[in-house]
């Protein structure tokens, strides 16, 4: 099974070697047919502590690193 890759914005960088990434998804509401935004936060591994709040990054699914961390940052798209 291929690894999932998501894109989001870094919203937390206080932890050592970890960033919190907010991933937003959009979908049409089944009844209202209106575009709805929902977001979810993922903890991702940042080996060199190089990503800061506001950076847009891609995260990739990986083996569990800790209790909450199952993603790793693979690239930055910019600010």
From Swiss-Prot:
Source species, domain of life: Bacteria
Protein name: Small ribosomal subunit protein uS17
Cited function: One of the primary rRNA binding proteins, it binds specifically to the 5'-end of 16S ribosomal RNA.
GO cellular component labels: cytosolic small ribosomal subunit
The species this protein was found in: Rhizobium etli (strain CIAT 652)
Family matches, as PANTHER family: 40S RIBOSOMAL PROTEIN S11 FAMILY MEMBER, SMALL RIBOSOMAL SUBUNIT PROTEIN US17M
Family label: Belongs to the universal ribosomal protein uS17 family.
GO molecular function per UniProt: rRNA binding; structural constituent of ribosome
HAMAP family: Ribosomal_uS17_B (MF_01345_B)
Pfam family, one: Ribosomal_S17
An individual GO BP term: translation
Key words of the record: Ribonucleoprotein, Ribosomal protein, RNA-binding, rRNA-binding
Oligomeric and partner information: Part of the 30S ribosomal subunit.
Taxonomic classification: Bacteria, Pseudomonadati, Pseudomonadota, Alphaproteobacteria, Hyphomicrobiales
Record carries keyword rRNA-binding: yes
């Amino acid at each position: 099974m291929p690894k999932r890759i998501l894109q989001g914005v870094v919203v937390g960088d206080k932890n050592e070697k970890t960033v919190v990434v907010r991933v937003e998804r959009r979908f049409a509401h089944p009844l209202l047919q209106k575009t709805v935004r929902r977001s979810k936060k993922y903890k991702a591994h940042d080996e060199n502590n190089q990503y800061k709040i506001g950076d847009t990054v891609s995260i990739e699914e990986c083996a569990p690193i800790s209790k909450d961390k199952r993603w790793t940052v693979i690239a930055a798209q910019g600010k």
